[in-house]
Structure formats: structure tokens, C-alpha cells
């Protein structure tokens, strides 16, 4: 697997996409991200992250032209995207391992 450096927000978008299970577009991702990270998220920021992820080969997209209404671009996580999320998860687990005691001491 080619390793691509993921920006923090790109990782958030990939994780939100995995929670949506399958293809999704930017609006549900905005709602999921706002719910999970507890702050406002712009649709433009999500779309920019999606385009970057697509350029890295971590997501694919397709246009859906409905009989009526707006055209939507649907995105889907690729196998490489799934591998990138798993690699980031493993890295974060290693990074945080052993800090529970330190954080409890500072919390007390």
C-alpha cells in the first residue's frame, strides 16, 4: 500500500464515511461530523477533503443525475482508504498507549 499522509480532518471524513456504510454525499457527512466532533463543519471543507482523498486514491466518486432535483456526487471509501484508516488507528493506539496513568494524575 502506498502511504499517504492524512490530515486530521481527512481522517475524520474517512471515518464518517465508514459510519455511513457505503456511498454517501457531503450533506450526511457534515451532519455526522458535527455530531461526532461537536463543532460546526462547513460543507465546503468536507468537499475539499473529499477531493483530496479522491486524488490520493482513498475514495472514489460518481455523479448521480436524478430525474428531478440537483445532481449529487456520491463518494465511497476504497480498499486503500480502509487500509489508511486502519493504519492511522494502529498508530494512534501506539501513540496513546501508556498515557492513561499520566492523564489520570493530571486530572486529579
Tell where the protein language model's regions lie, with residue ranges.
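Amphipathic alpha-helical dimerization/coiled-coil segments
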Residues: 83-108
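Accessory beta->alpha helical hairpin/"wing" motif in late/C-terminal subdomains of nucleic-acid enzymes
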Residues: 77-81
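Basic amphipathic alpha-helical segments that dock to polyanions
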Residues: 46-53
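Beta-hairpin "wing" of winged helix-turn-helix
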Residues: 54-71, 76
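Short beta-strand/turn micro-motifs at beta-sheet edges
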Residues: 1-4, 62-64
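N-terminal helix-turn-helix DNA-binding core of bacterial DNA-binding proteins
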Residues: 2-45
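Short, contiguous hydrophobic alpha-helices characteristic of membrane insertion segments
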Residues: 2-3, 50, 106-108
Amino acid at each position: 500500500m502506498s502511504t499517504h499522509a492524512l490530515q486530521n480532518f481527512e481522517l475524520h471524513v474517512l471515518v464518517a464515511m465508514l459510519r455511513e456504510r457505503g456511498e454517501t454525499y457531503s450533506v450526511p457527512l457534515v451532519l455526522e461530523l458535527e455530531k461526532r466532533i461537536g463543532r460546526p463543519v462547513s460543507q465546503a471543507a468536507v468537499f475539499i477533503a473529499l477531493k483530496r482523498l479522491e486524488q490520493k486514491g482513498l475514495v472514489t466518486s460518481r455523479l448521480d443525475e436524478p430525474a428531478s432535483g440537483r445532481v449529487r456526487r456520491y463518494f465511497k471509501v476504497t480498499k486503500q482508504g480502509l487500509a489508511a484508516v486502519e493504519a492511522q488507528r494502529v498508530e494512534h493506539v501506539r501513540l496513546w498507549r501508556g498515557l492513561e496513568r499520566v492523564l489520570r494524575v493530571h486530572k486529579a
